[in-house]
Design a protein with these regions (language model features):
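Positively charged, polar, low-complexity stretches
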Residues: 1-105
Length: 105
């Protein structure tokens, strides 16, 4: 029997004007209710994004209001972590991770 994804969304709306990696980590921890053991580093972010077992909704949306003001290197790392985390959920039949950024005009 195949379990279907619960289509109820969990929206993590990421605030604007995040100035650095520390602010981004704090915002993600707050909006995604990361556990107390979250280490506020890239490895810990990837681990938590690939778990999210504490969120019961089936569709988890991380919506950015703007692009975080990170260094080019940190922005690349963040993008790669998000892509890898999304990919890690591809075969999961009960959850789906969606990440949104504003369209650049």
């Amino acid at each position: 029997m195949t379990t279907k994804i619960n289509q109820t969304p969990y929206l993590a709306l990421i605030k604007e004007e995040l100035k650095d990696k520390d602010e981004l980590m704090e915002e993600l921890k707050l909006k995604l209710n990361f556990p107390d053991y979250f280490g506020s580093n890239w490895d810990a972010l990837f681990d938590c994004l690939c778990d999210l077992s504490w969120i019961h909704e089936g569709v988890i949306i991380i919506k950015h209001r703007d692009i975080p003001k990170l260094s080019i290197q940190d922005l690349e790392i963040y993008k790669d972590i998000l892509q890898d985390a999304i990919y890690s959920w591809n075969d999961d039949e009960t959850h789906k991770l969606i990440v949104e950024f504003p369209t650049l005009s």
